[in-house]
Amino acid sequence: MNPSSRFLKLLNIHPGEWPLVQKLFSLQFFQGAGIALFFTAAISQFLEKFPISELAYVFIISAFLLWIAGIVSNKLEHKLSLQKLSVVMTLIMATSMLFFWLGEFVFSGNWFYYIMLAWFNVLYLINNLEFWGLAAQLYDVRQSKRLFGVISSGDIPAKFLGYTIALLAIPFIGTQNLLLAGFFGMLFSLFFNLKQFSHENKKSKSVSYYLS
């Protein structure tokens, strides 16, 4: 569905830019909602089992996990194309959410909940690296000044929706199953990820054909 020219003008979006803006906004929206659901499940279960003073250890664990995630991300950046890197990052986030959901049936130690809550920070890092890496490559400097605020705004309603869904859904599905809901949200974002590259590939082919 194409928005009205008045709406595009209000957001300072040129008509030809709307398809990509829409896909990036949707990507950020569903990933943000998935991470919000994951965080709700992780923090709720952690505080149910441990005093708030234990959060200090979570931050220490987070520091090590973020360091490792940064190294791995840097290695992948040099080995994979932008498209493959983005898909791999999305799959890592989705798979990790599924792992923690399954892990609650398998692992009984307290350490598991420390790792799960610390992993939220890793998810947030990967999401930002993926999204802004895509945006920086797909837009030039002039476009970025106009559009970065628009495409990144998907994160705000995503968090609102994610936390609202968590509040309403917990009495019916339980806190643990929010992890599974987050997994599906992250997996659905993959659709917009692949769709945006399909759009860019078609655009590149048409430009190449015109130039030839």
Spans of model-derived segments:
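A generic, lipid-embedded transmembrane alpha helix
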Residues: 31, 65-67, 92-103
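Substrate-agnostic recognition of the 12-TM MFS/MFS-like secondary transporter fold
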Residues: 20-73, 112-170, 208-212
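Intracellular loop-helix junctions on the cytosolic face of multi-pass helical membrane proteins
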Residues: 1-25, 52-53, 80-84, 91, ...
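A short N-terminal interaction module
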Residues: 71-83
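Generic beta-strand or strand-like secondary-structure segments
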Residues: 75, 94-97, 134
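Short, basic/polar, glycine-containing "phosphate-handling" surface segments that engage DNA
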Residues: 98, 131, 200
